Amino acid sequence: MRMVQNNATCWRDFVFLGFSSFGELQLLLFVLFLFLYLVTVTSNVFIIIVIRLDSHLHTPMYLFLSFLSFSETCYTLGIIPRMLSGLVMGGQAISFMGCATQMFFSASWACTNCFLLSVMGFDRYVAICAPLHYASRMNPALCAQLVGTSFLSGYLFGLGMTLVIFRLSFCSSHEIQHFFCDTPPVLSLACGDTRLSELGILILSLMVLLVSFFLITVSYAYILVAILRIPSAEGRRKAFSTCASHLTVVVIHYGCASFMYLRPKASYSLERDQLIAVTYTVATPLLNPIVYSLRNRAVQSALRNAFRGSLLGKG
């Protein structure tokens, strides 16, 4: 069972304990999470398809939304299936390299989501504060650069977090008190002095969360000033309504992420952290199509047209 791998670990694999402490409730959790998983993936994929097929939605706002749906879908696909398998079959083993790979992709997609949300905030800033110049400023070349930078930055930060964690030794235990290879529970298994790695994870997390959140805050500060200058109450309400869904997703996304990653290792709690992780992993990706998209009239119209076209095709 043991092996030496460049002094990085003493174990061949890790074992997820997942929700083993919930006992007989695991079957109920499996049904609940399976339902949420199917709804999340289906709704996000459907949003991507609708935006792709409807020419009225070929704008920067919906381009960014479709990439956010894509990123959320990839994040969900990388975590939830193994979690569901663990609920049915009990403790699931994962190799050292498999754990590192899962951490890299989950961290990369999570970071990418943060950067995409900041890009979407910038898009709302241009749309409200400079509407006459929106088309020229948010041109296809700039949109492609913003999306590409978001994904590249996400991958780089994900790689950095993974390298910081897996340079450590894991000799004391190989049981992960979690349902996937997230940085806090894996870091808690490391033996020896982990203060430098904790500091590295904290710095990387702060760079992702604070920088992207700062950009969103600056964008909305300008948006708020522009909205307050609108003379009519109805005009202010309409302007704010275009940002309300994005703000809802931002608050929940950054609230959960900050609680999960901006704390010292000593403050980790199994039950509490699993609840927050489930909210971040399962519920947050579901908010994208429900809160941000399905409340949007243009998306609602596109969905109706898609269903109408599907029914006519069957007829």
Listing of model-derived features with the role each one plays in the protein:
Residues 1-315:
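Transmembrane helical core of 7TM receptor-like proteins
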